[in-house]
Amino acid sequence: MRLVKLSLVAALAVGSFSALNAKPLEEAIKNVDFTGELRYRYENNSENNGQIGDISSVSGKQDHRIRVRLGLKADVGDGFKIFGQAQYANDKAAGYINSNTPDGRTPTNKPFNLRQAYLQYDLADYGFGLVLGRQELGTIWTSDFVGTAAKAIYSPVDGISIAAFAVDSFEENTGDSDAISVSKLNLLPNAAQQAAINSRIYEYNMYGAAFLGKDIGGSGFDANIWFAQLMKTATFYAADLAYTLPLGEQDSWKLRFTYMGNNVDNSFNELLGDIADSGQLFNLYGTVNLYGFDGTLGGIMYGKKNKVTINTIEDTGSAGLNVIGREILYGRGSWTGISNGQTTLAYASVGYTLPGDFRIGLRGVIGGTSDTLTTGQGSTGGGDKSEYVLDLDYKYSNNLKFFGWYSILNYDNKVYGTSKRDAVRLQAAYTF
């Protein structure tokens, strides 16, 4: 091998030559789109009797949570685009000293991580798109879950798309800890068994397809049909239907129905000790927006009595379940990700938006979970339940928004008595 050494003068000459051939910054970034989010949250909760569980993302005391996402998409020509997104979401600086944060200190040494990185190819003239790499999955069963996946979308006409996807691996950790975890069921006292099942849920590939219809034919009708196979875990299928009737320039009435079903694989059921079963979720609600007022009325039923069921793959999915309270869908027994027994809830909300884009609202949820599963470790989430929420929202601009809520969640179990959890979240978010 022949080694070549450059003198300092030669190295400077090479650097100068490279600089002369470099593109100006303005030209280099003209086909690059920058996106970002800066989010701050303050969260706190307190609970008596300890039967509700810590499934909710508001599981700490006096937590200051910071999340930063920075992304860029470069158009490299001929329909190809490259997207990358870095995220900082390790921060959970507790102002309250406990066993998890014994010194109550603020971490400043946590790194950014690569959250998304994918190649996108679009054939605009043919309505075809392809995305390959680490990306948000965007399914009805996930919220902002990331995975290494391939996704193809074909849009033959405006408002209608056909999608197919294959997920090779799922995100290891989510910032809000809302991936499925049997450790929070209070059913399996063996920690090693819990860990084995948790890793097993996301161990295998997922394949699926969807029909996506938005305002079909200008009728105000949306129809989304989904199917997916999470190998050796469950087969999922879902329908999300909605109709919107305009009542004016800014006023409307909307009716939405969601059905989610699945068939659990026998091998997964055996891991859980034969207490799992196929599940179904039904949710129906109507929403009206009129003269600054908004109101929602609906009902939801999911799960199966005395069985463990999977309803969503991460968080509450993306089928509009976030209109139901704030905490109740995360509580023990009624967690939508993996639940014990059958949960039936009725819910309502009302709000008013003042001039200046300040909104105040109230939410209420009543119902319960039918469940008699027990391990002698305590309540598994059965009994009567209710939640009452105060919402505050302020839209300073299209980029900067503030919101907060205060929730009171109640459980009433005949054996383990009454439990109450108070939770609060304050948030400021800037997006660009």
Language-model segment annotations:
Residues 52-54, 99-102, 148-151, 179-184, ...:
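Flexible, surface-exposed loop regions and adjacent strand-edge segments
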Residues 42-48, 90-96, 138-140, 170-174, ...:
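Gram-negative outer-membrane beta-barrel proteins
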Residues 166-206:
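Short, flexible helix-coil linker/hinge segments at the edges of structured domains or between repeats
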Residues 52-58, 102-105, 136-138, 180-182, ...:
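Extracellular loop and loop/strand-boundary signature of outer-membrane beta-barrel proteins
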Residues 127-140, 150, 162-166, 209, ...:
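Transmembrane beta-strand segments that form the barrel wall of outer-membrane beta-barrel proteins
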Residues 111, 136-149, 170-173, 201-203, ...:
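Solvent-exposed loop/turn segments connecting transmembrane beta-strands
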Residues 2-133, 153-155, 242, 246-249, ...:
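Beta-barrel outer-membrane channel/assembly domains of diderm bacteria
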Residues 182, 214, 218-220, 242-373:
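Detector for outer-membrane/organellar transmembrane beta-barrel domains
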